Amino acid sequence: MASLANGLNDRTREVGVCKTVAAIAGGYLLLCFIAPAMMPEGSVPELSGRANAMDYATEGSWGNQDHGEDSPVGHDQSAHGGTFAWTELNPVWAFVYGFGDLNCHQKHERSWEINGNQMPVCTRDIGIFLGLFAGALLFGWRGLNRWTIRDSFLSVFPDHALEPIYLADRRMIAMLVVIGIGLGPMAVDGFTQMLTDYESNNPLRILTGIAAGVVMGWWFCSALCARTKYFGDDPASVLLPADARLTLK
């Protein structure tokens, strides 16, 4: 059997890992649309919580209190459709909204509604999950295990395009530049919104989220696929662009 561009004979692990990551990201993304569509109309009011906190688990949770309409986080929940408790939903919908509660601010003005129900996460996070799905598919299509995360990450590009980077030994810089291109727009948009009076818009949140999600999914799959044991722990057996060789220091 002819060897691949990394010196191995197959991409079984790369394909399997990427299918798993894509299924998780894509599955949750799909549920974010299905849950509000299937729930009774008006079941989820306008929310406004905190990231990395459970704000709407029960009727007595933080998000269901009166924090004032001018508060930087939270609002007067009674003025926005009443209380919401995702623990009272069926197990699947509870997982979808509970995960969103923990990971997202769930600000209603930054979220979409379906069937009169606010979606579990904001539009930025919708973009991120879509990007994670796309990034996993990208690495599953092109990526190779090349021992290190940086070399595996860059394997998505054609070897001939990588030759100048390998000849100059700028692989780490190249990877960081690509990641920066993906994360930069979201960071600028998000931090500008947080630190100034600027307010982004949902289409821009989606686009910057997608760009960030792509490089996150791409890097994550690279990290999971970069394994030395498939080369017999022999760095000399790894094929790299420009006939470069890995050496252990």
Model-predicted segments: where are they?
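Mid-length scaffold segments of soluble, non-membrane domains
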Residues: 112-152
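Hydrophobic cores of alpha-helical transmembrane segments in multi-pass inner/ER membrane proteins
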Residues: 131-136, 210-226
